[in-house]
Amino acid sequence: MARLLIVHHTPSPSMQALFEAVVAGATHPDIEGVEVVRRAALAATATDVLEADGYLLGTPANLGSMSGALKHFFDTIYYPCLDETRGRPFGYWIHGNSDISGTERQLLAITTGLAWAKAAESVTATGDPDRKTLEACTELGGTLAATLMA
């Protein structure tokens, strides 16, 4: 069975709502043969990454940067996972109250360094999430999970 790892930092109600929408898409009844594993960024390990076939990453934009929790996750897994996870599919969502472009640049720089393959349209949002944003997150989760279906 394929495994999708969702690594997230959800300190706010907005991030929690987006996370729940991503999970709803990834665990949709039409998705078969994919185990969805959820880990808070500070709890996710290199073993989690190595055992997964694809990744979804969620972070708030804090003062123009990704959350310290997600950065810590990347710092922890980078070298142990660098060679073993090349080419694996990933997607991401970012939420902030203002500019999120720095956060996206950081996340893409790290995932490029890992040689992960972006496999779904990212979701970036500012302000309170609306229905369109939540639907985009559901689509993100479903798309990544469907990518892993055998």
What are these regions (language model features)?
Residues 2-29:
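N-terminal beta1-alpha1 ligand-phosphate binding loop
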Residues 10-13, 94-99, 124-130:
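Short histidine/acidic/glycine/proline-rich micro-motifs that form metal-
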Residues 18, 69, 103, 133-136:
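Residues at alpha-helix caps and immediate loop-helix transition turns in enzyme cores, especially N-
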Residues 23, 27-29, 45, 117-150:
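Glycine-rich phosphate/pyrophosphate-binding loop and the adjoining helix
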Residues 26-33, 82-84:
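Short helix-capping segments at alpha-helix termini
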Residues 32-43:
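A short beta-strand-loop structural module common to alpha/beta enzyme folds
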Residues 41-118:
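Helix-loop-strand module that forms the ligand-binding subsite of alpha/beta enzymes
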